[in-house]
Regions:
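Catalytic-core regions built around general acid/base machinery
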Residues: 102-106, 132-147
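C-terminal and late-domain segments of enzyme folds
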Residues: 20-48, 59, 63-67, 73-78, ...
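Positively charged n-region of N-terminal signal peptides that target proteins for export
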Residues: 1-6
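Glycine/threonine-rich flexible loop motifs
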Residues: 120-133
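Structural recognition of the beta-strand scaffold that forms the well-ordered cores
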Residues: 24-25, 51-56, 81-84, 112-116, ...
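Bacterial N-terminal signal peptides
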Residues: 7-17
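Substrate-binding cleft of extracellular glycoside hydrolase catalytic domains
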Residues: 62-123
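Catalytic nucleophile loop
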Residues: 114-117, 139-165
């Protein structure tokens, strides 16, 4: 109850306080040669010479991690500096550095703050112990409220919403409801505001499976899952995707659930895949595709001249596999079938699995508003897909899933 009360106060503070800054949510595995993302961070911070404070608080090897980030930012014109506030950094006094007035002043004078990857619990436990902001965290908020940038990759992205996964297991564990406060989930730092839930490594690791139950449990209607080596630049209500891939926008404003079913279920979710260069307004719901998409092919299943290109009608046996959810959405948009289905389940149930037979069928289907764009201008087969509808239905799987065929 105390946790929920504190969370409510944090949410009210976020909702009633205007934040002028830009949050850059990076999906992890950010490569050194990703010019679009590194350059954008420096640009948003003010350009050449911009002072940027780098926190490798989450990292297993903070000095190495901070050094790589500082070097990448400085190659793009920044004046970045590591702030030695990390539980796993050797030969420092963590509490002394955390409360050092000179370090706090240096952070407050920065134009941007960058959080490294690693273990996100180290960030919140260090900067916001027991839910109370430290002076160092207040300095970071001062940067953000002054129109500066807070960027973070992987663990540094996880802390961007008011709630976050702390040390979650796999997707199936969360889908099956086996998660606890302070273990698998916790409060984040809230830089993207109170109404948007974010997650990272999203398509690579099939994290739609954990985002949906989390959003329902935490009361979110909007979620944004950012893919690896990709960033979502969140400025007020505007979101722009930059980098290598895209992000999945989840809208549960029209979604319902059947309380009679003894497991997680969902009907009427809306999924939109925003590709690199796409922009989306979280308030109006309007998406503006990248310029090269607008010059290419629009796909509207409701149009009289709709001619689907994809001929295969696949059933996806692991809908939570690497990028499979987006592949299924593209097949729905540009295929003949009115729906596309897939399964989420454990082929080999774990010894401590309380529901080894429980699986989930994901049903994507066409409905009003489904539209998209395709382009090969950047050398791939790139789709933008808006408003694919999704149901998640609990099912009973066979254990084992199959048995060898016996000889006659």
């Amino acid at each position: 109850m105390r946790f929920l009360t504190r969370l409510t106060l944090v949410a009210l503070w976020c909702a009633t306080t205007a934040h002028a800054g830009t949050a850059i949510v990076i999906g992890g595995a950010l490569k050194n040669d990703n010019e679009a993302v590194w350059a954008r961070i420096v640009e948003e911070a003010g350009g050449a010479g911009a002072p940027i404070a780098v926190f490798a608080t989450a990292a297993a090897n903070p000095e190495r991690s901070a050094g790589l980030i500082v070097a990448a930012l400085n190659r793009h014109g920044a004046n970045a500096e590591a702030i030695p506030v990390a539980p796993r950094q050797k030969d420092i006094d963590l509490q002394a550095n955390l409360n050092d007035p000179k370090l706090i002043a240096k952070v407050a004078a920065s134009k941007a703050v960058f959080f490294s990857g690693g273990a996100q619990e180290y960030i919140v436990d260090t900067l916001q112990p027991k839910g109370e902001p430290t002076q160092m965290l207040k300095a970071i908020w001062q940067v953000f409220d002054g129109g500066g940038v807070v960027a973070g990759s992987s663990a540094g992205a996880a802390i961007m919403s008011r709630m976050m996964f702390r040390d979650a297991g796999d997707n199936m564990q969360i889908l099956k409801g086996q998660w606890r406060e302070g273990r698998e989930y916790d409060r984040g730092l809230g830089f993207v505001g109170p109404d948007l839930f974010v997650d990272q490594h999203f398509l690579k690791r099939g994290r739609i499976g954990r985002m949906l139950p989390a959003m329902r449990a935490f009361g979110y209607t909007l979620g944004l899952g950012v893919e690896e080596n990709t960033a979502a630049v969140v400025k007020g209500s505007e979101v722009e995707i930059v980098g290598a891939r895209g992000a999945l926008l989840v809208d549960l404003s029209e979604a319902t659930a059947d309380a009679k079913l003894p497991a997680f279920n969902l009907r009427g979710a809306l999924l939109s895949y925003l590709d690199r260069g796409d922009k989306h307004n979280l308030k109006t719901g309007v998406t503006t595709p990248a310029a090269h998409k607008l010059r290419d092919q629009k796909i509207d299943p409701a149009a009289s001249d709709y001619k689907p290109y994809l001929q295969n009608e696949n059933y996806f046996l692991d809908i939570l596999a690497d990028n499979t959810i987006v592949t299924a959405m593209a097949q729905l948009l540009d295929g003949r079938a009115p729906e596309v289905r897939g399964l989420a389940y454990r082929v080999r149930p774990r010894p401590n699995d309380l529901s080894p037979e429980l699986g989930f069928e994901f049903r994507l289907y066409k409905g009003p508003g489904l539209v998209g764009w395709f382009s090969g201008a950047l050398g791939g087969e790139d789709y933008t897909v808006l408003k694919a509808r999704l149901d998640v239905i609990p099912v009973r799987m066979s254990t084992p899933l199959f048995t060898p065929l016996a000889p006659n």
